[in-house]
């Protein structure tokens, strides 16, 4: 009997895709076997093409589908005259057709199966139709007593049949009563720990404003804080840290990031927060600030942003600022002022801004870098014009 299908188990759902509904198609297969013994086989005088048939058989007493075996002792035709041909014949069937696989074998003198041959697929049978093997076994091999295939001159054929019955569909819906794992609230929980100042063990004084914190959290998030609390520094022994180079609001936003990985007010203070992130080696926050500053680059602020990026080794921001300067310079030279990418403010020459003039005085190396980048980007486009060949 075939085993009935079952819906997917909850344990399987973590390793494979899960659909809202599912269906199993179970193809039922009925298997049965039949043994046919032919006594005094060597006396069979049937000529080539003549047939011996077994009695009919079925899968059970209530099965109306009847089968029989057909043997051509001296082959079916000239091609198989030196062979025994063996076929499975559908004698009667209540259906118009049926599909079945079959396997033939011989039983030797030790009652062991030998010389087995089987169909490679399920064949389509209709009433009166047979399938089998025209060259099942050579006659000379079969009749040779040394091979033990005709003990007491008896030929015993063994047949196994697998009949395909109707298919059955079993469908259903995936159970929604599986365990629902709550979302991770680590960031929210740590944020509440910071806001509520519970179990704090150190204190920061930022320009007169007090902030309480947890050494373990700070040390885990920042290598600078880790070094500060790990060594016998004054901040470690007194659990008190004085900070005079950061605005309290900037420090508060930085600490919110340390505890939660988020900085909701980043856009309002990206420049100052970049400096804080650089000072305390908060690399992710630093790149987040770079991204915010890149998205707000303008003719008026690009020089100041370039100085800021250079000061805090923000290489991605620095590259974007230089690229912005190059693009504005090229567009200005070409006179491209489309309303989409170029407005009246951008039309102002960057070199006329106070930020650029200040940068010339304080960071001349950045001016040189910007011009080098501009020259290298324009060389292919604005290279020395080639002399045109004179035409005769």
UniProtKB/Swiss-Prot annotation:
GO terms for cellular component: Cul3-RING ubiquitin ligase complex; nucleus. GO terms for molecular function: identical protein binding. Keywords: Nucleus, Ubl conjugation pathway. Pathway: Protein modification; protein ubiquitination. PROSITE patterns: BTB, MATH. GO terms for biological process: negative regulation of protein ubiquitination; proteasome-mediated ubiquitin-dependent protein catabolic process; protein ubiquitination. The keyword Nucleus applies. Pfam families: BTB, MATH_2. It is found in: Nucleus. Gene3D superfamilies: 6.10.250.3030, 6.20.250.50, Apoptosis, Tumor Necrosis Factor Receptor Associated Protein 2, Chain A, Potassium Channel Kv1.1, Chain A. Residues 31-161 form the MATH domain. CDD domains: BACK_SPOPL. Homodimer. Heterodimer with SPOP. Component of cullin-RING-based BCR (BTB-CUL3-RBX1) E3 ubiquitin-protein ligase complexes containing homodimeric SPOPL or the heterodimer formed by SPOP and SPOPL. Interacts with CUL3 and MACROH2A1. Component of a cullin-RING-based BCR (BTB-CUL3-RBX1) E3 ubiquitin-protein ligase complex that mediates the ubiquitination and subsequent proteasomal degradation of target proteins, but with relatively low efficiency. Cullin-RING-based BCR (BTB-CUL3-RBX1) E3 ubiquitin-protein ligase complexes containing homodimeric SPOPL or the heterodimer formed by SPOP and SPOPL are less efficient than ubiquitin ligase complexes containing only SPOP. May function to down-regulate the activity of cullin-RING-based BCR (BTB-CUL3-RBX1) E3 ubiquitin-protein ligase complexes that contain SPOP. This is Speckle-type POZ protein-like. It comes from Mus musculus (Mouse). The lineage of its organism: Eukaryota, Metazoa, Chordata, Craniata, Vertebrata.
